From Swiss-Prot:
InterPro entries: 26S_Proteasome_ATPase (IPR050221), AAA+_ATPase (IPR003593), AAA_lid_3 (IPR041569), ATPase_AAA_core (IPR003959), ATPase_AAA_CS (IPR003960), NA-bd_OB-fold (IPR012340), P-loop_NTPase (IPR027417), Prot_ATP_ID_OB_2nd (IPR032501). GO terms for cellular component: cytoplasm; nucleus; proteasome accessory complex; proteasome regulatory particle, base subcomplex. It comes from Xenopus laevis. Belongs to the AAA ATPase family. This is 26S proteasome regulatory subunit 6A-B. ATP binds at G192, P193, P194, G195, T196, G197, K198, T199. It is found in: Cytoplasm; Nucleus. May form a heterodimer with a related family member. One of its GO terms (biological process) is proteasome-mediated ubiquitin-dependent protein catabolic process. GO terms for molecular function: ATP binding; ATP hydrolysis activity; proteasome-activating activity. SUPFAM superfamilies: P-loop containing nucleoside triphosphate hydrolases (SSF52540). The 26S proteasome is involved in the ATP-dependent degradation of ubiquitinated proteins. The regulatory (or ATPase) complex confers ATP dependency and substrate specificity to the 26S complex. Keywords: ATP-binding, Cytoplasm, Nucleotide-binding, Nucleus, Proteasome.
Amino acid sequence: MSTEEIIQRTRLLDSEIKIMKSEVLRVTHELQAMRDKIKENSEKIKVNKTLPYLVSNVIELLDVDPNDQEEDGANIDLDSQRKGKCAVIKTSTRQTYFLPVIGLVDAEKLKPGDLVGVNKDSYLILETLPTEYDSRVKAMEVDERPTEQYSDIGGLDKQIQELVEAIVLPMNHKEKFENLGIQPPKGVLMYGPPGTGKTLLARACAAQTKATFLKLAGPQLVQMFIGDGAKLVRDAFSLAKEKAPSIIFIDELDAIGNKRFDSEKAGDREVQRTMLELLNQLDGFQPTTQVKVIAATNRVDILDPALLRSGRLDRKIEFPMPNEEARARIMQIHSRKMNVSPDVNYEELARCTDDFNGAQCKAVCVEAGIIALRRGATELTHEDYMEGILEVQAKKKANLQYYA
């Protein structure tokens, strides 16, 4: 290469270096501007995300294509030109808004009915909120797992077996039902006289399964305002589905499940509406889901036939008055932690407690302990139990005379 060519080549390289330096300087300025913009937007987001939020419900999600919208001579909003999902929300102030830009939450994670927090000025969705349940329904969830066991229940072996087949087996061994191709029962109705162990067996069943236990009392579902009781039933089943596997125990079902009749009273109609919502929920969830219903009542004769039909409360378990052998077993169970003399004859005690239910047999053991405590003894004798039987019988007769 000649000297002139080298000089020319050097000049070209110098000009290329200058161009590249100016390009680097321009890109550096752009990068700094972008950083400033990101910082500014982050500050705006931080300001927008300050609490409190306006609570809203997602009504509908829409797919909007800006190419479908033709506006002649009108100013075009950049936000409306973004292709993707849009949302229709309803705020707690009962106003409905259409959002072309959803906000900071991924649109794919939203679904109609979700509870969201929006900015009170721009209405952009800032955060998804947990599902709202009635505080009374949350209070129905039993936080502490029941400690009762099947060995604490005497004289109900057949009833225990039927309840295990209907509730425990579908939860713990679902594959056995799938292999046979049968559908497990949706629910169980336990009926019988008071004090025969219905609630006790339900608590023992909840203790044997690792399920969430929701305890509803029938009178709790009878509310003053129209639709309030039905909302409690809906929220209870929604909470049970969210926390599945779960067991819903409805005690004193006859408070809301009595036979329907024509009535002019608003209170009677409200009770019937609550029962219709219960029927709807029993039909609504699939039998394969891990939500089971146990209902208990001592007035099965006044229940509505719609509740008793197959497909709702499929398994019906009767709790009769305990026989002589069952009464002896119940008193043995309640006396096993007491300091009892070896001469106590439980068979003879069972023969003396004719027409006693399980709760009264337990009361005999408690009364015997109090009698022994009264005379300063260190152990319970057979005579203490006999006196306890007399005490419980006297209370029983007094109650009968009082109610008569």
